[in-house]
């Protein structure tokens, strides 16, 4: 289903390196990328930062930001991408943080709210999405949106 999209991403990034920082997708972007033979030429690895503690320790996310903004926010998505890019020393990083369900969070964010972050040597940005469906559908839509964002920005 996502194989053509994933192949397009890897082809477009030929000569560059990519890493991921994933929360609600739990490694789904990395799994999609590594399903393609030869993906190691581009994809170097990822950090699954499902908890705030891991976001702080492995990605260097400021605990003050996490406490005040919550993990599901544009600044956190951007900081995750920066942290992954720095930790894994790649040209490009994409990150995902969101609420796949079944419940929202203590900040009042709804199920399906996802922020996808992106960092390269020219820009740091993020996009906000609200996906519908069950937990698996939200996660799959987030993976697809992250891959499309990489294509759009390269």
Where are these regions (language model features)?
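Short alpha-helical segments enriched in small residues
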Residues: 1-154
């Amino acid at each position: 289903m996502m194989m053509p999209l994933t192949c397009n991403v890897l082809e477009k990034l030929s000569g560059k390196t990519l890493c991921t920082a994933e929360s609600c997708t739990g490694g789904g972007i990395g799994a999609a990328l590594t399903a393609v033979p030869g993906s190691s030429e581009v994809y170097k690895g990822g950090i699954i930062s499902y908890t705030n503690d891991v976001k702080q320790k492995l990605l260097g996310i400021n605990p003050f930001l996490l406490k005040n903004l919550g993990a599901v926010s544009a600044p956190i998505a951007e900081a995750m991408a920066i942290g992954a890019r720095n930790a894994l020393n790649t040209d490009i990083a994409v990150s995902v943080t969101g609420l796949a369900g079944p419940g929202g969070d203590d900040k009042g964010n709804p199920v399906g709210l996802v922020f996808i972050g992106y960092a390269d040597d020219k820009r740091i940005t993020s996009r906000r999405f609200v996906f519908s469906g069950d937990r698996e559908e939200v996660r799959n839509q987030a993976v697809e949106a992250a891959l499309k964002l990489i294509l759009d920005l390269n």
